[in-house]
């Protein structure tokens, strides 16, 4: 059956090819499309029913017609050759080198569709990952094996932040085998050059694998890239015992491609035109993060997405939030004031933070200090709102101090630029900023930590 060439292409719709009178095909099966001039394309079976197979074509459909195409079903799924030689390399969305280096040849070939980790085999994430970003490390801590997305908006600094995290991320244990898989989905050529230059100039390319998909590439490429990136990370994590950080940007472009293909299949649309199965599809990507009991490696995910119209209720951030373990939210207001990284800590959350901080991981005062910073910043923003109504001179003396704290917090703690801060520097800076407030306002920190880490003189 696998040697049969089908000449029964009945329809071509967008990136989809419809083949009739087909027998014994399977979901995700790879297909060869052979044109009469000898040119060959590849595709993947999306659906098969009653002898009809719907094939999603990799790459462009230009030149393909119902009369000049023969289809051969290979009987196998998309398998990626993987090797530790991929470290330091740059590939396109299909895992093909674009850095003028040699192709990857390996006896190890893995199905890119992978599978989610069996819940019984999961090991609880518990190790701190230092990103060098105070608003993340200090207040929304990333834990090894966690999936923590960044919610951004058009024109915000998520690309700059992604590149900074990629070059700075590490664990605190010396000698750790740490690596980065960076997948860029639907980006411009300018953005692609920016990422390449950032990785090369910082020296972080040597322990990274980069996959780039351009906006000019076909939509199918965007569907494949995150799965190829995660397959590479899984090999390095579970076969080579590396702790891998996977950064995927922009997942909104992935979901737009999913919507485009769903429309071409004439499926009934869900919310805002996205397919009803988008939650399930996203979970097959996000749930590949984690640690496996008995294995030394791990996969930590930072998917980045731009919220259309800055709308956090859009299906892309909404469904992502249901699957992942928190979110880092970027603020357009802070961006307008030239604060970078423009992280809105009050809208951000790391649900696994408590498992990666404290005396065994960072420092004993970490939890209480983070809570105090949150509470004090919230009061400072309330004081700012009140001052805009009644004037700053009408505020109480304590409210004026909270207002000053909020300004200092944004300008010194949040706004750190390209400077990398250790967790020790981040925690110490937090105590420095709190010293502008009366010591009796420190309701969230343990009293024993105030004289040990605080910056007050004479207890005031």
UniProtKB/Swiss-Prot annotation:
One of the protein's GO biological processes: proton motive force-driven plasma membrane ATP synthesis
Keywords (A to Z) from UniProt: ATP synthesis, Cell membrane, Hydrogen ion transport, Ion transport, Membrane, Transport
Main location: membrane
Topology in the lipid bilayer: Peripheral membrane protein
KW Membrane (keyword) present: yes
Places the protein is found: Cell membrane
GO cellular component, one term: plasma membrane
Superkingdom of origin organism: Archaea
Annotated InterPro entries: ATP-synt_VA_C, ATPase_F1/V1/A1_a/bsu_N, ATPase_F1/V1/A1_a/bsu_nucl-bd, P-loop_NTPase, V-ATPase_su_B/beta
UniProt KW Acyltransferase keyword: no
Pfam families in the cross-refs: ATP-synt_ab, ATP-synt_ab_N, ATP-synt_VA_C
Molecular functions (GO terms): ATP binding; proton-transporting ATP synthase activity, rotational mechanism
Annotated Gene3D superfamilies: 3.40.50.12240
HAMAP family referenced in this protein's UniProt entry, alphabetically: ATP_synth_B_arch
Assembly mode: Has multiple subunits with at least A(3), B(3), C, D, E, F, H, I and proteolipid K(x).
Protein family (similarity comment): Belongs to the ATPase alpha/beta chains family.
Role: Component of the A-type ATP synthase that produces ATP from ADP in the presence of a proton gradient across the membrane. The B chain is a regulatory subunit.
Name of this protein: A-type ATP synthase subunit B
Gene: atpB
